[in-house]
Amino acid sequence: MDSQTENINEDNRRYLYENMTPEEKDKYDGMIQNLPVLQDKINRDHSSYMEEFRHRLEIFRGQFNIILFTPNKSIKSFKELLLFFSHISNIYPTELAFIPEGLIRILQENYLIIPHEMRLAMVDSLSLLRKKDLLTPLEVLPLFFNLLKCQDKILRKKLCDCIISDLTKINQ
């Protein structure tokens, strides 16, 4: 999609949310709060919850595209959905294959302008995907070393822990 189409989609999503009734907004916001429950249900029986998974994936893809084209934007529900999908990524690997590549691309190109909490959520997600062996050390370590340039003490601590953990596993 081109950037003009993305802007139209973003405007449409914003317009739809702004024009929701209070009940619809509560339902949408409640959907984010129920992610841990859905994660547990998916872990138990993933085929029964495919419809809910797809619904949330559609929302997440829209938010992912917004972040891809406007990386300095912070979306709270994006962070929650990102961690949710990272936790269940081993259950739906083909549907969620775009996440690691997209996160690496966003962080490589825009790590200095991404808001602090978004960077932390993205690094947490990549770390979780790495622990699930959905990413190799060769895919994340160069990025993690590059991210050490950020003037973010919490992020640097997290990155050092991830790097040391990966290097320890490699050397065993």
Feature annotation, model-predicted:
Residues 155-156:
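Eukaryote-specific intrinsically disordered, low-complexity regulatory regions enriched
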Residues 2-150, 163-171:
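Alpha-helical solenoid scaffolds in large eukaryotic transport, assembly, and signaling factors
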